[in-house]
Every structure is written in structure tokens, then in C-alpha cells.
């Protein structure tokens, strides 16, 4: 776990870009490594019998689909809550959505769920909630079903794990949107982020774990040398 490096939004994006363009890695490989290692982190935190994963449409949601698949393979009862229409998934996230669908993982569309209270009914008997809605690249206010899901998560007593960063937290400033997930554990990828050093942000992050996604050390050293 690398606790020395701190990469902002720009450098975090460069990790993926260089891994693919220069080091010959596939985006699907990076997503698989990220999601699998978060799933292992969850499985190490017992009890982990039932997990509800709330996904967005981007790569953070794609990580959520990988997490769901690995938890399902380990015998965990998994439910995935969609905050976006299935046809909005693109690229690697769409591939992993299709795999989860074929694997018959339980998927529930929240787009017509009218209230946070209605969303919270899906949390019954869960050991963990997983926030896989927005990650380091996100800015601005969460809207629609995503906003309602955040309210439901924060009103719940179920332990919450955020993927990369809690939805609604700005990677660089540590500022919180008017609604932002308050996580018990945050699994951020490759390095810490600037927001991890902001005192006011700590109540949203909870325990921070840095998760390896298998990028070469040479790649990180190359980014370290950049201004």
C-alpha cells in the first residue's frame, strides 16, 4: 500500500492513459485489477454475506460490476442498484455490465425510485453498501437517482465502502457537494489523493486503503518526475 505518493486528478488520469498508451495494458485489465482487489478487501472484512453495490455509468461503475462478479463468485449475496439506464454504459463499463447480466447477478434499476426511503428498502440485511457511483474524475453536484442514493446511504446504519472516493467529494480540493457519501472505508486506487490530506474531508473518507491495480513501478516513477 503506497502511502507516500499523492496524485491529483490530472496525475490519476495519467496513470490509466500511460498504462494503456505506453505500457500496453488494456483498460479492461486495469478495471479488473481494481475491482477484484476491492472485492478482496471486502471479503477480508467479516461479516460479508450480503453486499449492495450502487453503480454510476462511468468507470467507477465499471469497477462496481467487477466487484459484484468477484463477490458473487465467492458466494456473497450481491445486489447491484443502477443509478442510470443500462444503455448509458460505454466501453469497459459496458463490457462488465454485460458480464454481470449474463452471470445473473441481481440488478435493480433505481431510475424510477421516487425517494431515498424507497431506495433504502434494498439495504435490508446488508453487511456492506458499496458506493461505485463517481470517482476521482467527477466534479459538480450529484443529481437524480444518484443524489437520492447518497441520501439513502447516509441515512443507513450499514457499513459503507467507497470505490476510489466517496461520491460527491472533490479529488483535489476535498470539498463536498451538498450531498456526499460518508464512507466507513475508502478504497482509493494507486496513490492517496489531495483530498485525503484535508481535515474536513476525513469524516467522509473514513479509513483510507490504497489499492494496487498492477501498473508498473516505472510508470509511477515517470509520473513522479512530471511537474
UniProtKB/Swiss-Prot annotation:
Positions that bind K(+): 60, 131, 167
Keyword NADP: yes
Domain (YjeF N-terminal) ranges: 12-221
GO function terms (MF aspect): metal ion binding; NAD(P)HX epimerase activity; nucleotide binding
Gene3D superfamilies xref list: YjeF N-terminal domain
E.C. numbers: 5.1.99.6
Annotated positions binding (6S)-NADPHX: 59-63, 135-141, 164
Keyword NADP among record annotations: yes
Domain of life of the organism encoding this protein: Bacteria
Co-factor requirement: K(+)
InterPro entries xrefs: YjeF_N_dom, YjeF_N_dom_sf
Protein name: NAD(P)H-hydrate epimerase
Organism, as annotated: Pirellula staleyi (strain ATCC 27377 / DSM 6068 / ICPB 4128)
Amino acid at each position: 500500500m503506497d502511502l507516500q505518493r499523492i496524485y491529483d486528478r490530472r496525475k490519476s488520469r495519467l496513470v490509466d492513459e500511460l498504462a494503456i498508451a505506453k505500457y500496453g495494458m488494456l483498460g479492461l485489465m486495469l478495471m479488473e485489477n481494481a475491482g477484484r482487489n476491492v472485492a478482496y478487501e471486502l471479503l477480508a472484512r467479516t461479516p460479508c454475506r450480503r453486499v449492495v453495490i450502487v453503480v454510476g455509468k462511468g468507470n467507477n461503475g465499471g469497477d462496481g460490476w467487477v466487484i459484484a462478479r468477484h463477490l458473487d463468485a465467492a458466494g456473497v449475496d450481491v445486489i447491484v442498484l443502477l443509478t442510470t439506464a443500462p444503455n448509458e454504459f460505454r466501453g469497459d463499463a459496458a463490457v462488465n455490465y454485460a458480464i454481470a447480466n449474463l452471470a445473473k447477478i441481481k440488478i435493480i434499476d433505481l431510475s424510477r425510485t421516487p425517494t431515498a426511503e424507497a431506495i433504502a428498502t434494498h439495504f435490508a440485511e446488508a453487511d456492506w453498501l458499496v458506493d461505485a457511483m463517481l470517482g476521482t474524475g467527477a466534479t459538480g453536484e450529484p443529481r437524480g437517482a444518484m443524489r437520492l442514493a447518497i441520501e439513502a446511504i447516509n441515512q443507513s446504519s450499514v457499513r459503507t465502502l467507497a470505490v476510489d472516493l466517496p461520491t460527491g467529494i472533490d479529488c483535489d480540493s476535498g470539498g463536498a457537494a451538498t450531498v456526499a457519501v460518508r464512507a466507513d472505508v475508502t478504497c482509493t486506487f494507486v496513490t492517496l489523493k489531495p483530498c485525503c490530506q484535508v481535515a474536513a474531508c476525513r469524516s467522509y473518507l473514513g479509513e483510507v486503503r490504497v489499492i494496487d491495480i498492477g501498473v508498473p513501478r516505472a510508470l509511477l516513477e515517470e509520473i513522479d518526475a512530471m511537474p
